C-alpha cells in the first residue's frame, strides 16, 4: 500500500507462515478476495484486521473466520504509530464496525481486541480479567445521547462507547476520556 513497496501475495504470506497475518485487510489496499480466502483457508495463523485497512475486506475476513468456526484467529490492530499517525480510537472504531456491520455480538468483538490479541501476542499476564493478571482495565458505558439500550446494544448499533475511567497496574490513570463522548455512567472510586 505504501509508495515504492512491493506486492506480497497469498503465496508469500503462506510460505512465510508468520504468527500473525498482519493487515490481512490491507492498509488500505487489500489483496483480491480469492487470495484472502486462500490465506484464511490454507493458513492457521492469527488474522489481524486493522483500522486503517479496507473495511469491506475486514468484514470478508470476519465472515470467513465465522464460517470456519475460527473466530479465535481474529485479532485487531491500528497500524499505530505509523505514517498515518496515532489512532487513539482505532481499536474502538474497528470493533464497533465489526459488531455493528459484521454480525458478531459486541462482547465477541471486545474479545478480539483483548483476550485474542493477548493470547496471540503472548501477553500472558493480560487480556482477560482473572486473578494474577495485570489490573489494566477500561471502564466504559453507553455514550450519553447515543442510541441503544446499554453499552452492548449501543455498540451493536455502531456507536462508540464512552470511556469513564482507565486503570493501569491497579491505579486510576485517567477518568473521562477526551477522545470519546461522555459515558452515561461513570465509575466512582470508593476508599475504605
What are these regions (language model features)?
Residues 1, 24, 51, 76, ...:
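Short loop/turn and capping residues at structural boundaries
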Residues 2-3, 119-122, 147:
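Short gly/ser/thr-rich secondary-structure transition/capping motifs
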Residues 8-10, 59, 118, 151, ...:
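Short Asp/Glu-rich motifs
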Residues 60-142:
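His/Asp/Glu-enriched, well-ordered alpha-helical/loop segment
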